[in-house]
Amino acid sequence: MGRDTPVAPAGPDLGRPDARAVFVTQWYVPDRAAGTRLLDEVADAWRAADPPDGLLAFHAHLSTDGDTVLAYAQARDPDAYRPFVRSLRGAARAEPVEYRLRRGVVLASSARPPGCAVVATFDVDGAERQDRIIESVVGALDGAPADQHRGMLSAHFHTSTDGSRVLNYARWTSDEAHEAFLAGATRRATLRATGATPGVRPIGFKRYHLHHAIDLGRSRTGRDRSTS
């Protein structure tokens, strides 16, 4: 298919109440063209398969620097995901990190779909550190004037089931809004919050554009709302 531009849908419904588990998979690629091919391969594998009822939605992204593909899959039944992906072929079989949504913060609303998603991850020493770093970052956001994070629509914090990771999926109005945030005071406050928390090691962040969105519930009823 060769698509190299993001699609229009709003991305995953991060706060949907029936999503009991989230599975995140990353692939590292040499360049944007390879990333686009991999995106298409994995999304096509999901579309061609017969997903179990326990899976809800699949969203695939490419980083703006073109070196990372990220898939974000939501499941009603946490036990349904791994047997399904192991039945697929090629890159779609890759093992994910399993998360639970711990907290969501909505900072602004927009009539337009988000322009990008920024995914930040942290390596942490157990469940208590997971909760501590989430509270620290949320506190930094809550304490900042709105003009210091203009363009940030929401931040949704996920904790890995093995206690080793925290993932923040943040939605932004545009790449430019996120770039402005990186130069501002709130960004510095969040860095201080993460750096001052023992047992927490920031891994970094990537900015992504959405390329594929598959609503598995609609696919099963014959009303496929997938986009590519």
Set out the residue ranges of the language-model regions.
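Short S/T/G/P-rich N-terminal loop/turn motif that feeds into the first structured element of a domain
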Residues: M1-S228
